[in-house]
A protein has these predicted regions:
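Conserved interdomain hinge at the start of the Helicase C-terminal
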Residues: 1-8
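Core RecA-like ATPase module of SF1/SF2 helicases and allied nucleic-acid translocases
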Residues: 11-172
Length: 172
């Protein structure tokens, strides 16, 4: 494992929401273009933040949405932004089919609904990352604020220990 000061990996896990927002802002600002769609934070919801939307942007659902018996997306499900037009933001992920094989799933979200359901996901809290397996390099922030059980959750997402970095977070 390695200790770093500047954000280095595009996948990150933290304990505090303040850290999550800071790391998400860092990567969103670094990757955005002037022409990208801007969606402001929802002042009524402190989990949200200003977002620039572009192809490839990682996002995470903050609640589940149903269409009858179908789950359109589940709380904590992760997506990448695909196509963006004047009305919709297309979100893509892989889901298991009835045989357990991975298949592409696409959800078209109305632009005006986007901030009600999705957050930036360059960084997610340990709570949101439970059950995930991370194959690429990632950084853990707020280590000192985590209990032993939460540290285990953050560390055990890794396929191999060499992929884990430790970043300097902020106390809330």
């Amino acid at each position: 494992a390695h200790a770093i000061k500047e954000p280095l990996t595009e996948r990150n896990i933290c304990y505090y929401n303040k850290t999550r927002k800071r790391i998400n802002k860092y990567w969103n600002d670094k990757k955005k273009n002037d022409k990208d769609l801007f969606i402001p934070a929802d002042e009524e919801n402190d989990k949200t933040q200003d977002m620039y939307i572009y192809e490839g942007l990682p996002v995470i659902a903050m609640k589940t949405k149903h269409d009858g018996d179908n789950i359109l997306f589940a709380n904590s499900e992760t997506f990448n932004v695909g196509n963006i037009d004047n009305e919709y933001i297309s979100l893509c992920c892989e889901r298991p089919d009835e045989n357990g094989e991975k298949e592409m799933y696409i959800y078209d979200c109305l632009i005006e609904d986007f901030r009600d359901y999705f957050l930036l996901n360059y960084c997610s809290t340990t709570h949101k990352s439970q059950g995930e397996t991370i194959t690429e390099e990632y950084t853990i922030y707020d280590w000192d604020g985590m209990t032993t059980k939460i540290k285990y959750t953050a560390l055990s997402r890794a396929v191999k220990y060499e992929n884990v970095y430790f970043g300097y977070g902020e106390r809330e």
